[in-house]
Amino acid sequence: RADYKVIPLINIGDTGEIKYKYAPKYIETFPHSIGWMLLRDYNCDGKKDVFYSASGGVMSVSKNISSIKLAFDLIDNKVSSDQYPGGDIGIYIPSADIPAIGYVDHDGDIDIITFGVLGTSLEYHRNYGMENHGTCDSLDYTLKNYCWGHFSEVGINTNKLVLKDTCNYNVPIPEGTTGGSGSSRHVGSTVTMFDNNGDSVMDLLLGDVTFDNVVMGLNGGTAPNTNSAMVSV
């Protein structure tokens, strides 16, 4: 990441075996000069598309158009979200951060969870592709919570989390409860969401460039977009 280069690794292992081989021939296929990159199938065609950081902290998406050869086509160089009260604004993600991109509400379109620009809490950008267009191939985002997970990071000297925190500022009727303070933090945080126990609400793994451990947050909610407060770490 320090050199903003893509390092392709192909799994050449047998079934059940993980064995990677460096494959430099694919380097030119991927976007250049990026801070982070995640492969996600946003349009449900079975091919992994590319979500990545572009210049200025905005997020871009390139669609996988491969047939015989691996190929991508830029479809959105500035993914935006309807953000209260500012309207449609590009989703800002520092190049040193890595957001979580996946299915928060399990409706088939890709959602985004990422740390806010200045805060220690997580923003939840919900994709309304299925609701508004009836298909998963739309990137139709709305900021539904400035403080998803009902927690905040303590500050720059520790990666501990404060649970049941109170959000100083949020969208009207936020989804997934409220939480998180507005204090500043350093960049270099990674967010991974996954369902640890199969209850359909997302738990979290949080990493930080300053610390050598990963913090796990367990979601005590029972339904996506209704109650998603972290109850233990």
Predicted segment positions?
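Beta-propeller-forming repeat regions
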Residues: 1-233
